[in-house]
């Protein structure tokens, strides 16, 4: 009776161990057949973002932005959510820029559109979008959306941050900063 229980327990342990491997193997087949991503694509899954370095039968190998190597089981990739940032030829870049209350919005919009027009990596179709996004506690937020080729995304994103900061300063468009008013109690 005890030996039968031991054999049964051993079989359960083996089944559990094999089920993970079989799930990863099946996931690998699904990934290889459906091709939701390919080597060189930038993907995100399970909170990890990286460039696909290699697709193997049991796992996919990613290289992160800081050059870490991550092995993700294909079972998890085939049954979970995968965001592929490289799949489409274009991507939309978005910025939310806070300016001071009292700034002339027409001037802010015109300056922003001029900055966008000067960057040849930004596509004209679909047309860039600039609008007043929100009236926050200490800033008037402007939203900017523009389409770029996928490979230009990060370059445009960071370059525009620098350009907007520089040009807005030259144009006298102020950026807000949080302020705290302290009232001193009288004794």
Q: Where are the language model's segments positioned?
A:
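Residues at alpha-helix boundaries and the short loops/turns that link adjacent helices
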Residues: 16, 46, 102, 150-151
């Amino acid at each position: 009776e005890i030996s039968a229980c031991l054999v049964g327990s051993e079989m359960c342990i083996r089944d559990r161990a094999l089920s993970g491997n079989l799930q990863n193997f099946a996931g690998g087949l699904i990934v290889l057949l459906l091709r939701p991503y390919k080597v060189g694509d930038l993907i995100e899954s399970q909170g990890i973002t990286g460039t696909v370095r290699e697709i193997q039968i049991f796992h996919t190998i990613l290289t992160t932005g800081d050059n870490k190597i991550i092995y993700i089981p294909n079972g998890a990739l085939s049954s979970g959510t995968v965001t592929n940032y490289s799949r489409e030829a274009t991507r939309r870049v978005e910025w939310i820029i806070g300016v001071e209350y009292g700034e002339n919005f027409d001037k802010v919009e015109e300056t922003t559109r001029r900055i966008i027009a000067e960057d040849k990596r930004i596509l004209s179709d679909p047309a860039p979008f600039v609008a007043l996004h929100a009236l926050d506690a200490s800033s008037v937020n402007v939203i900017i959306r523009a389409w770029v080729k996928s490979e230009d995304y990060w370059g445009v994103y960071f370059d525009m941050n620098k350009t907007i900061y520089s040009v807005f300063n030259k144009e006298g468009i102020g950026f807000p900063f949080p302020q705290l008013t302290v009232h001193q109690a009288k004794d």
